[in-house]
């Protein structure tokens, strides 16, 4: 797969070729998680509607829910004004967080 050159030209990546993905639940508007993507992960997401991210610790792509069954069906992908973050709007099946929580922001409230 190859990311559309027009999309690729708008992205601003970090030194590792990655950019941030914010994931929001369709319907509730809950922010579910923040992850990293590379061009190939975004391309796969756009073509399959399966949320695909890049694991910095493993150095590889991963499809959300491939092992856990907690999948994300992608309804929309939007690029922010700076080009360094994408916003995915998804239908979440199961918990979005690796802890099993609905969102990665269900833990300690700081304020």
From Swiss-Prot:
Signal peptide: none annotated. Zn(2+) binds at residues 81, 97, 104. Its main location: cytoplasm. The keyword Iron-sulfur does not apply. GO terms for biological process: L-histidine biosynthetic process. Gene3D superfamilies: Phosphoribosyl-AMP cyclohydrolase (3.10.20.810). GO terms for cellular component: cytoplasm. It catalyses: 1-(5-phospho-beta-D-ribosyl)-5'-AMP + H2O = 1-(5-phospho-beta-D-ribosyl)-5-[(5-phospho-beta-D-ribosylamino)methylideneamino]imidazole-4-carboxamide. One of its GO terms (molecular function) is zinc ion binding. InterPro entries: PRA-CH (IPR026660), PRib_AMP_CycHydrolase_dom (IPR002496), PRib_AMP_CycHydrolase_sf (IPR038019). It is found in: Cytoplasm. Mg(2+) binds at residues 80, 82, 84. Catalyzes the hydrolysis of the adenine ring of phosphoribosyl-AMP. Belongs to the PRA-CH family. This is Phosphoribosyl-AMP cyclohydrolase. The gene is hisI.
